[in-house]
Structure formats: C-alpha cells, structure tokens
UniProtKB/Swiss-Prot annotation:
Cellular location(s): Cytoplasm
Gene that encodes it: thrB
Any one of the GO CC terms: cytoplasm
Keyword Amino-acid biosynthesis: yes
Domain of life: Bacteria
Species annotation: Synechococcus sp. (strain RCC307)
Keyword annotations from UniProtKB, A to Z: Amino-acid biosynthesis, ATP-binding, Cytoplasm, Kinase, Nucleotide-binding, Threonine biosynthesis, Transferase
Protein name: Homoserine kinase
Catalytic reaction annotation: L-homoserine + ATP = O-phospho-L-homoserine + ADP + H(+)
Record-annotated disulphide pairs: none
Listed pathway(s): Amino-acid biosynthesis; L-threonine biosynthesis; L-threonine from L-aspartate: step 4/5
Stated family: Belongs to the GHMP kinase family. Homoserine kinase subfamily.
Enzyme class at the top of the EC tree: transferase
Amino acid sequence: MGKPEIGTTVVVDVPATTANLGPGFDCLGAALDLNNQFQLKVLEGGAERFELIIESKEGSHLRGGPDNLVYRAAQRVWREVGMQPIALEARVQLAVPPARGMGSSATAIVAGLMGANALAGEALGKEKLLELAIDIEGHPDNVVPSLLGGLCLTAQAASRRWRVVRCEWHENVQAVVAIPSIRLSTADARRAMPKQIVVPDAVSNLGSLTLLLQGLRSGNGDLITDGMHDRLHEPYRWPLIQGGSAVRKAAMDAGAWGCVISGAGPSLLALCPPDKGRAVAEAMEKSWEQEGVQTRALPLKLQSGGSRWRPKPS
C-alpha cells in the first residue's frame, strides 16, 4: 500500500464518553457532545517520529514520541493492512481533559485508529476498528461509544466476539457532568477495587442495570434513581474523590435522579429532567468549590453520531 504524500492531513473529531453509569461496570458507556479534535499530518521521516501539539493547558504534560497512545493506535492499523509506519504530527484541540473519567484516553485511541485508517484508504471496516480499540484500551465502555456514538452496551460473547447493543436514551433525560481540577488515574481507581466479588453484589448490579436501561429508554426518573446504584466499584472509589459525596448530595438536592462516578472518576455524572440541568450543574460546581476544588459542570446532550474524520484541504 502506498504512502500518502507529505503534508496530507486528516481531521478526526472524537466525543467524550461517560462510562459505567453506576451499575454498568466495564460494559456500559455513552458519548457526550464534548469533542477532542485531532489534526493528523503526514511528515517526513521514519516510524519513530511523532510530534504532538496540544492546544490546551490541560494537556501540557502530554508528550509525543513513538509511545504516545495516538501513535501506538495508528501503528496497529498500519500493521493490520501491511503498510509501512508514517511519521506524523498531531495537533489536538483538547476539550476532554485527561485523567478525569471522561474517556480522554479513548479519544486518543479512536483518533489514532480512524486517522491512520483514513490515511490507509479506509482499508479496515468499523468492526475491525472496534476490535482494535477494545484490545488497546483493555475494556470497551469508553472506546465503543466514542467510536460509534450513543449509549452502548458491549459484551464479549461465548464465541469471544464482541457484541454491541445500541440502547435508547429518552429525550427527557439530561446528563450533567461535573469535571473537577483534581485528577485520578484509572490505574489507581482500579487498584482500589477488591479482587473478588460476592454473589449478592453481582445480583444487585444485574437488577440495577436492568432498571437503569429501562429508565433511560422510557425517561422514567424513578427507574433511573433505583437503577443508578452500584455495589461493584463505586463503594471503593468514592473515598478517592475529594468532596465527591458532598457533590453527589448537592446534585440530588437540586433535582437529580441520581449521581454516579463518571468512568474511573473523579468527574461525576448526574441524570435529571432537562429543566433541572442548569440548577444541578450549578449546585455541583458550588459544592465542589466549597471543598476547595475548581470545577466546571456542564449539561451535555447524548452524542449519537460517534467519531468522524474528514480531509483537511491543503
């Protein structure tokens, strides 16, 4: 397969995601209308050259080089299609901050896969890109909705094939995400969890997930409230989030049906009626700032289109 011309640029828009939504640990996630944009430009040079330009203070600690997640994902595509690796520059408009539980690493993986596939003439289909994304990330709950959009339930069948179900999200369900200035790595959040679970906790989560999905489908707030309870990961992660319990209470007092940890945290996700969205966001911001934590809380819509790429005119 031929190498694209030097200077060829593709632009990839990748949405933020919120994962788990309480009981859907490592299988349920939703894309939200907050995007990272990646401009991937072909450079002169060999496979070890990857330059990274972040247009945000949030990502000032991120570095280029061959070990960068965007480039590692791109190389997976090129290996699959038998194409020689390309030197790249990535210019990133970063709206989804890293280490906040909003799927920032998933945006990097998906951007690398989609951008590299575009430069390879879209040689791989979406199902293969999904498989690669899950393999790189290690779990599907962020990368799948980031790639496909919407609310996605993903499970590995007995055949080892990944199965994705696009679930309904009623228009009367508003998501509010509070993003604090503090960080929490996914690795630290996973280390806090027990190595084994007990049967009653597993049964409880199965029931909660069923109620939650039905509540999201129908817009029934009572079902959402009952369905957002988790016993597998949240009890062990709340203590890691400074002021998190107070923020959750503030969201509920302002009219939220439920408030859970977004992904591994520390961002929090509240679900509420649309007319309560602004009040819930303001309550969450105020509560966290009373704890000394700068916070940005946003009412966000479900992003149903997933990631998109386009060529940038030269």
